[in-house]
Amino acid sequence: MVGRHGTRPTWRDAIDHDTLSGDRATPHTADATPVLRGERTIGNTAMGLGGLRGSMSDTFVVVGGDAAGMAAASKAKRDDPDLDVVVFEKGEWVSYGACGLPYYVKGEIQSLDHLVSVTPEEFREERDVDLRTGHEVVAIDPDDRTVTAESDDGEVVQSYDHLLIATGAAATVPPIAGTDREGVYTLGSMSDGKELREYVARARGGESLQQPDRGPACQYLETCTGPVGIVGGGYIGIEMAEALAANGFEVHLFQRGDAVLTGFSDATSEAVADHLREQDVVLYLDAEVEELAGEDEIEAVVTADDRVPVDMALLGTGVRPRTALAEDAGIEIGETGAIATDAYRETSAPDVYAAGDCAESTHVVTGEPAYVPLALTANRHGRAVGQTVAGTPTEGGGIAGTAAVKAFDVEAARTGLVGPRAARTAGFDPVTETITAKSRAGYYPEGGTVTVTLTADRDSGRLLGASLVSEYGEGAVHRSHAIVGAITEGATVADLENYDLAYAPPFNTTWDPVLVAAKVLSGTLR
């Protein structure tokens, strides 16, 4: 049991959350009868235990100024202007789009400022949020209801009535020799992005970075640059392979497993890998990196079979939740390694919430805790905490692990439990089918193909997961949205087969590839 709101929600409970329309929340319940969950009363104006407002001047403190933290701060202040909202952020940037950093390094986005959604000045002057940048929270005392923060001006102790931990995640540094050498980078923050962009500019001899209308091959550039190594074949690794290749670098990508994008289907991973090779990215699969070799600076990436000379290395081996602050405060850490919460994002400490990349979520398929650090989850859960603190208890909602990636001229998406292994681990008896179909009407002058992999439970027919891949612009990512809805609602493959999807020749075929995949899988299940 986490917090004071009962046991973890099932997948059905996880999706039974308030539906937002603008800034108003309309419960799914048909009347105004309160719905009891644990010890909190939902459905009327009275707050339960965790959200009880003690006065008209309660203080809401937020630790962390990115997506979840600033979404919570903004929503809480908007819904309750009398609330004192204080945000501590150890860096200088807040509310920025970290997902755009590879495109900044590439040169498609010209300024870091373009990644900032709302400036610190706007938060302070227009949203009336007491935002304190350059302040690192070093301790939380749930008993005294205080946080201690340090800055260049000294130490400050701030009391709170409600607290949100939104400390995010840090780039994972694998336990291999040489990660501290000069020329080894990660990409997890604005500062990281700035350093990488400066490296690219130096390597290019001051030549302007690649522009969106220029191709990835070195022949398009006046100055070609040396070899670089990328450790990891996930989202960051693949996006940065494109960014660096577009600027003339010879890219070597090392993946410990036998496929890139391991959370996707085999068909998707193979299609992406083939396209990377077409773009002259050198792939090393089943390649455990043993050392980043060199003296002071990196000189080579070393595996059991190869020693590849490089001028720079990027670690793209995932992220880990920043939980030290919560752990030191005695707050429960979940089995995934992230902060455990209930459906309302409240932790084991009263009136202390956690949201974003530092916290667990509930998977809509399994009903179990999951750690899937993605932007929409952080924004949604932060907003839910803001509403709860301001007086409207709001569940954060479950997640399906939906994600997308662009690799040069290919796009891919995934959602749910993809493939037999993930489904079987969760206790299902999986059946999987993969189809490839035209992305647009056959007579239409443009178009390509979409490959769709669907996984369902043999006994119930319930749709469990999907993976899609297509040429960039041919709709793999947008097609995934219908499947996400089906999975979230617990639909069967037969239900998906009967979805009334839009059709016009420039967009798809009469039988959209998603429907074709559902029909094929339905036939296998019968």
Which sequence ranges carry the predicted segments?
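FAD-site-proximal beta/loop scaffold in flavoenzymes
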Residues: 180-222, 296-387, 482-485
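Glycine-rich Rossmann-fold phosphate-binding loop(s) that bind the pyrophosphate
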Residues: 64-68, 188, 231-234
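Beta1-alpha1 glycine-rich phosphate/pyrophosphate-binding loop at the start
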Residues: 48-130, 238, 242-263
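Short linear motifs in low-complexity or flexible loops
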Residues: 7, 14, 19-21, 25, ...
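A Rossmann-like FAD-binding core segment of flavoenzymes
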Residues: 82-84, 131-153, 158, 246-341
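A conserved FAD-binding loop/helix module that cradles the flavin
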Residues: 341, 355-417, 507-521
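Rossmann-like dinucleotide-binding cores of NAD(P)H-dependent redox enzymes
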Residues: 225-229, 235-291, 374-377, 401-414, ...
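Flexible, glycine-rich terminal cap/loop adjacent to redox cofactors
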Residues: 63-67, 71, 75-84, 88-90, ...
